[in-house]
Amino acid sequence: MDPSGPGPSSAAAGGAPAVAAAPQPPAQLSRYESQKRRDWNTFLQYLRNHRPPLTLARCSGAHVIEFLRYLDQFGKTKVHASGCAFYGQPSPPGPCPCPLRQAWGSLDALIGRLRAAYEESGGTPESNPFAARAVRIYLREVRDSQAKARGIPYEKKKRKRSQAAQPAGVEPSGSSSAAAAAAGGGDTGSGGGAAATTTAQPGGSGTAPSAS
């Protein structure tokens, strides 16, 4: 064999030429993560505009409460004053001059997102101003006052027991049909299921987080 002759091609020696992998697009953030990022950026902007200037390291629970009160100007929830004729009515029959405020549920969700964003940005749980006791007390006061003013009680929903207590020796309803379906390989998709209930938090707009 002539050593000066052409050698085997790289394609033949190593198989098919390597193809550069296309860059993967960045993973799309979930709705929660996107909202958390917007809320965090809004809070940082609030600190930059604060007078006197305020840094995140010096931020306390009192500053967080001040921020929540600042957000009231962007609220969309009518909160009746104690002297209003519609005070305590969940469905007032007409308009009134009472101001719009941030709903308690929106503020509560906002604080939860900011509390998580603070620690994700390097803060420690011990120094987290969004987890301060003063903030929890403030949110509780907002909840109670809005419940009275709007006539809408805020109560924790108790999970209903999936099955009522059955007498001894009595088979729960539906178990025989489920067993028959399992034995015969039948389609169980047509069976009744519990409907899931979701509660959507209203979103905000403009320069403030979606806490309205």
UniProtKB/Swiss-Prot annotation:
Residues 1-22, 173-182 have a biased composition (Low complexity). Residues 31-158 form the ALOG domain. This is Protein G1-like7. Residues 183-194 have a biased composition (Gly residues). Signal peptide: none annotated. Probable transcription regulator that acts as a developmental regulator by promoting cell growth in response to light. GO terms for biological process: mRNA transcription; post-embryonic plant morphogenesis; response to light stimulus. A motif (Nuclear localization signal) lies at residues 156-160. GO terms for molecular function: DNA binding. It comes from the Eukaryota. It comes from Oryza sativa subsp. indica. InterPro entries: ALOG (IPR040222), ALOG_dom (IPR006936). It is found in: Nucleus.
